[in-house]
From Swiss-Prot:
Organismal lineage: Eukaryota, Fungi, Dikarya, Ascomycota, Saccharomycotina
Organism: Saccharomyces cerevisiae (strain ATCC 204508 / S288c) (Baker's yeast)
Region of interest: Disordered: 15-41, 125-145
Other notes: Present with 2550 molecules/cell in log phase SD medium.
This protein's name: Uncharacterized protein YMR074C
Keyword Membrane on entry: no
Amino acid sequence: MDPELQAIREARLAQLKNNSGGTNGDRNSGANNGGGENSAPVGAAIANFLEPQALERLSRVALVRRDRAQAVETYLKKLIATNNVTHKITEAEIVSILNGIAKQQNSQNNSKIIFERKDFSEDLNSFDKQNAKNDDDEDDDDFFD
C-alpha cells in the first residue's frame, strides 16, 4: 500500500473519531486536524447544508490548507445566515468557492513594484545650469586667470 494513501487514511480515521464525539482529550487527533485551533472540525457547523462529497472535499482541504477550509466555512455560514442557500452545496460548488478564495488570497499577496526613473538628459541639463551659475559667481576667485 502507498505510504501517502495510508497517511491520508489514518488522518481521515482520526478525524472521523473526533467527529463521533471523542471528548477524551486525545491530542494526536487534534494535531492531525491542523493544529487543533478549533475544537470543532471544519464543516461541522454547515454539514447539514452540504452533500456528503462536498463535506468530504472540505475535510480533505482542511488537512492540507486549514485556513482555506475555514474561509469556505465562513463564507458558507454567511450565505446560510442570509438564507441564500436553497439547495445542498455540491462538491463542484465547493471547488469553485475554493478557487475564488485562492484567487483572492493570491491577489492580496501579489505586490507590484514600479520604477520611475528620471530622464538622464534632464539631469545633465540641470547639472550644466548649476555649474554655469557657480562659474559666474566665482569669477574673481579664479586661480589660473
